[in-house]
Amino acid sequence: MSLLIKNVSFNEKTCDIHMANGLIQSIGPDLQVTAERTLDGQGLAALPSFINTHTHSAMTLFRGYADDIALFDWLEKKIWPIEAGLTEEAVYWGARLACLEMIKSGATYMNDMYWHHHGTMRALKDSGIRGTVSAVFLDHMNADNAKEQRAANEASFLEMKDFHPRVTFGMGPHAIYTVSPESLMWVKEFAAEHDLKIQIHCSEAER
């Protein structure tokens, strides 16, 4: 597939952009090249694609649900109970919708943390964009939960580390109020050992 965008604004200059096989081949004024598809970019600007640095993509499924309430009431009374009924297939379709919306708005990479992360990873693979997907790590300050969560994250890393070149596995400790200090240190060390990204919720709202 090759594409030629004509007369587009790039770095405050009007130019053409030629792309082929998923890569930019040349940028310049009045390019004399042929392409399978040509677009007129007059009045438009060419920008690098955007990065969504933190998302729960499958929560597109809950858009409009339980709006305008305090964070912890929203989490404990509304979101966590409904999330308990989610399946991997539901997460896949919610994430697919999010991927389509991101593509439409110019985002080609997302950093995601959510339940049933296998579904999100499949959605990324099928959508064509890139991303890091983290399994949610919550131990609620309980030692037995912590042991279970560590084992689950280790297993997910081993299972998904070679899933797809565009999709990488990351670590997602939920927050300092749902993950013990000991588990946070374990996440830090595990991520450093395997060169993984970490995302966490900080300074969200007053309790």
Each model region followed by its residue ranges:
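Histidine-rich, glycine-flanked metal-binding segment
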Residues: S2-L4, S9-L47
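Histidine-centered catalytic micro-motifs
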Residues: S49-T60, K197-E206
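Active-site gating loops and adjacent loop-to-helix segments of metal-dependent hydrolytic enzymes
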Residues: L61-W93, L100, S127-N142, K147, ...
